[in-house]
């Protein structure tokens, strides 16, 4: 990135002179889209972020939300998209490391990771290499630092072929008395740099993330990708937590984008102070580094602590006990400036608040667009349709299992509901939380968002909260990771603005605060153009009282009833069926009917917590066909889906509509479930029973389909040949 003339004029006016080379480099990174959110700050302000239980909202390294009077959950979400295309293994690994340190910087102990991933079609020349590298990077790093990866998403679409999306969400737990903020608010305090030595890896990473990828990116941009060291990260987690427990940490920041410049500047700006950094005191991994390189290096596994002078020796002693370097590199001042020194020489001096928050906001031109709602859909051959949908990489449970089997999802011994379900459940175990768990999920549907950005994003929120409800959880908060193309493209900027509007509307309707997030723009390639608009929604819920989870969810047994909850409507816009099977972009995108959706969520929580059901899944990508196959295929069932509450005109629409507000449950107490549904005002119908013979029989209108377990598993496993 380079500063434009308007930026330079503003900087000259503030400084009263031209910025020198070091100052200019710092402004280029701090005022990049990646750091400054220049195109989205004004849009994000409309999101509801406040609630009585929100302790720290947007603006710090991670959000903090109260669980009770003593404990809080810390949650953050980040993207590492460009680095993961250039170097998939290290790009993904350092994405994990960075978000873990964000959660750690708030004083929390990280307990879970989720990884929403998006790639091009598996038959793409470079895609299997990207998938393998990204999954190994996440697996190796997460497993070695001892934080379980318990959920996420996996999607394949041509728009991601040269710009994969690698998002990571991290959740931690902290005593409210031990929460640390990313600020330096006491002049005289000392800045201590802890962790790995500083090298040249990742220099300019913030600027690199603010540009589109090109044909030469794999080689030209490799120096902008950081290299991770999970062993050092593990020691950092232990050491920082010990220092926090002893009350020695007054402020803390991860050194991520723009490195030491960003960490020091934001701490000063948020604390209303200044900071002085001496680059001569920064431990280096490479000789001959220039001051600007030291200030902008994004070398991993480094954190900047604010420590009282009298506590410095104790903090350094703790770090050394765990084999970590810890060096005093500066101090907090009262002058409001970031002053960079090299020994006695002043290298740079700029107002901290101006550097952190002074980048002008940008409103780009936008170009509204729409796709036709009324589209002609050829009637398919039933056998071909069923096999095509169930063998899609976007449906295959086997492909997702191939991913999560590489992760240690049970380390720490907290994982009660494991990957493969609609939401993960993590038992908290701590004193006072023995009967409390967190439910975690991430969700997005870029195909819906592409066709209708606002309505599609509302649906992403509804699905995330619906998934929490399937395991009996009450929602606590949302975070978002907004992955879009260049805002300079008028269609993309329209998508971005409307998507954020949809997120805000849904959050207000469901009364769940959006407490933090990440914006990743310029996700496009000079050949392929922008990725599909991809707002990933992370949701955290709380469960109080865990007895029902001893026997839920479980595999359904022979004779249990299968019940479909909610109405299926003729809403196929952006569906897997229209886009992937027919190649049609258009149709009516599923609309969120908030009263109906809230009623379903309440019902799902009730029937789960009262052990009325053995298993449950919501209906989303791939419609009823994908949902019943995943839930019932391995055990076998006989289903008449024409009985489903519906308002559709064709059997294929009934089978593959992606209407919201629906779920499928199995139960040996059908009368109780139907009674609860009637009381909640949710349409419900028994559509068949579990047979236990390993054969899935589906009757819908004039069509009868039968698949045995082996056939179904063969379809699900068919995409794996690209990866094995």
From Swiss-Prot:
Amino-acid positions noted as binding substrate in the UniProt annotation, renumbered to this chain: 79-82, 101, 226, 298-300, 520
Enzyme class at the top of the EC tree: ligase
Keyword annotations: ATP-binding, Cytoplasm, Ligase, Magnesium, Metal-binding, Nucleotide-binding, Purine biosynthesis
Protein residues bound to Mg(2+) 2: 102, 254
Active site per UniProt: 34, 80
Complex formation: Monomer. Part of the FGAM synthase complex composed of 1 PurL, 1 PurQ and 2 PurS subunits.
Described purpose of this protein according to its UniProt entry: Part of the phosphoribosylformylglycinamidine synthase complex involved in the purines biosynthetic pathway. Catalyzes the ATP-dependent conversion of formylglycinamide ribonucleotide (FGAR) and glutamine to yield formylglycinamidine ribonucleotide (FGAM) and glutamate. The FGAM synthase complex is composed of three subunits. PurQ produces an ammonia molecule by converting glutamine to glutamate. PurL transfers the ammonia molecule to FGAR to form FGAM in an ATP-dependent manner.
Name used for this protein in its record: Phosphoribosylformylglycinamidine synthase subunit PurL
Species this protein is from: Methanopyrus kandleri (strain AV19 / DSM 6324 / JCM 9639 / NBRC 100938)
Gene name of the encoded protein: purL
């Amino acid at each position: 990135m380079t500063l434009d003339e308007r930026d330079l004029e503003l900087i000259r006016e503030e400084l009263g002179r031209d910025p020198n080379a070091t100052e200019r480099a710092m402004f280029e990174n701090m005022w990049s889209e990646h750091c400054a959110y220049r195109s989205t700050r004004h849009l994000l302000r409309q999101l509801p972020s406040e609630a009585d239980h929100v302790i720290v909202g947007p603006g710090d390294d991670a959000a903090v939300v109260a669980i009770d009077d003593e404990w809080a959950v810390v949650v953050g979400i980040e993207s590492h998209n460009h680095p993961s295309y250039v170097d998939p293994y290290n790009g993904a690994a350092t994405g994990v490391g960075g978000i873990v340190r964000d959660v750690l910087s708030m004083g929390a102990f990280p307990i879970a990771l989720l990884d929403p991933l998006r790639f091009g079609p598996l038959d793409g020349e470079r895609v299997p290499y990207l998938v393998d590298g990204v999954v190994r990077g996440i697996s190796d790093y997460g497993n070695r630092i001892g934080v379980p990866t318990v959920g996420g998403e996996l999607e394949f679409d041509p728009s991601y072929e040269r710009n994969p999306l690698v998002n990571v969400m991290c959740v931690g737990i902290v005593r409210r008395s031990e929460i640390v903020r990313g600020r330096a608010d006491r002049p005289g305090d000392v800045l201590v740099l802890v962790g790995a030595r500083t090298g040249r890896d990742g220099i300019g990473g913030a600027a690199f993330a603010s540009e589109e990828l090109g044909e030469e990116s794999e080689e030209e941009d490799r120096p902008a990708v950081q290299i991770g060291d999970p062993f050092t990260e593990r020691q950092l987690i232990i050491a920082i937590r010990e220092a926090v427990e002893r009350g020695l940490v007054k402020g803390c920041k991860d050194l991520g984008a723009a490195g030491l410049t960003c960490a020091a500047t934001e701490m000063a700006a948020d604390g209303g102070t200044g900071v002085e950094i001496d680059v001569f005191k920064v431990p280096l991994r490479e000789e001959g580094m220039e001051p600007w390189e030291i200030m902008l290096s994004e070398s991993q596994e480094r954190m900047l602590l604010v420590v009282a002078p009298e506590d410095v020796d104790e903090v350094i002693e703790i770090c050394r006990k765990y084999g970590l370097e810890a060096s005093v590199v500066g101090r907090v001042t009262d002058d409001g400036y970031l002053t960079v020194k090299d020994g006695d020489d002043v290298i740079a001096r700029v107002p901290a608040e101006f550097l952190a928050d002074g980048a002008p906001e940008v409103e780009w031109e936008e170009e509204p667009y729409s796709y036709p709602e009324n589209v002609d859909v050829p009637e398919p051959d039933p056998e071909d349709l069923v096999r095509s949908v169930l063998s899609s990489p976007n449906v295959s449970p086997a492909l997702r299992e191939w991913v999560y089997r590489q992760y240690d999802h049970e380390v720490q011994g907290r994982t009660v509901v494991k990957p493969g379900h609609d939401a993960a459940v993590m038992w908290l175990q701590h004193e006072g939380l023995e009967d409390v768990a967190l439910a975690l999920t991430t969700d997005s549907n870029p195909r819906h968002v592409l066709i209708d950005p606002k309505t599609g994003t509302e649906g992403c929120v509804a699905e995330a909260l619906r998934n929490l409800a399937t395991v009996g959880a009450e929602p606590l908060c949302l975070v978002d990771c907004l992955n879009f193309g260049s805002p300079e493209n008028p269609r993309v900027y329209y998508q971005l603005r409307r998507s954020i509007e949809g997120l805000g509307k849904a959050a207000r309707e469901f009364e769940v605060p959006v407490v933090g997030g990440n914006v990743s723009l310029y996700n496009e390639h000079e050949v392929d153009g922008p990725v599909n608009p991809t707002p990933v929604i992370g949701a955290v819920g709380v469960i109080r009282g865990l007895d029902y989870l001893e026997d839920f969810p479980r595999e359904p047994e022979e004779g249990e009833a299968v019940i479909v909850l909610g109405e299926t409507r003729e809403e196929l816009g952006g569906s897997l069926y229209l886009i992937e099977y027919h190649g049609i972009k258009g149709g009516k995108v599923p609309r969120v009917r908030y009263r109906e959706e809230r009623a379903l969520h309440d019902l799902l929580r009730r029937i789960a917590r009262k052990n009325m059901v053995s298993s449950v899944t919501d209906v989303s990508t791939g419609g009823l066909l994908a949902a019943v196959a995943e839930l019932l295929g391995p055990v076998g069932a006989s289903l008449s889906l024409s009985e489903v509450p519906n308002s559709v005109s064709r059997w294929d629409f009934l089978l593959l509509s992606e209407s919201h507000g629906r779920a499928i449950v199995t139960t040996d107490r059908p009368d109780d479930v139907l009674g609860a549904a009637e009381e909640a005002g949710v349409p419900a119908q028994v559509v068949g029973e579990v047979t236990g013979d390993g054969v899935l029989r589906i009757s819908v209108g004039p069509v009868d389909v039968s698949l045995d377990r082996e056939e179904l598993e063969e379809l699900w496993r068919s995409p794996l040949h690209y990866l094995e």
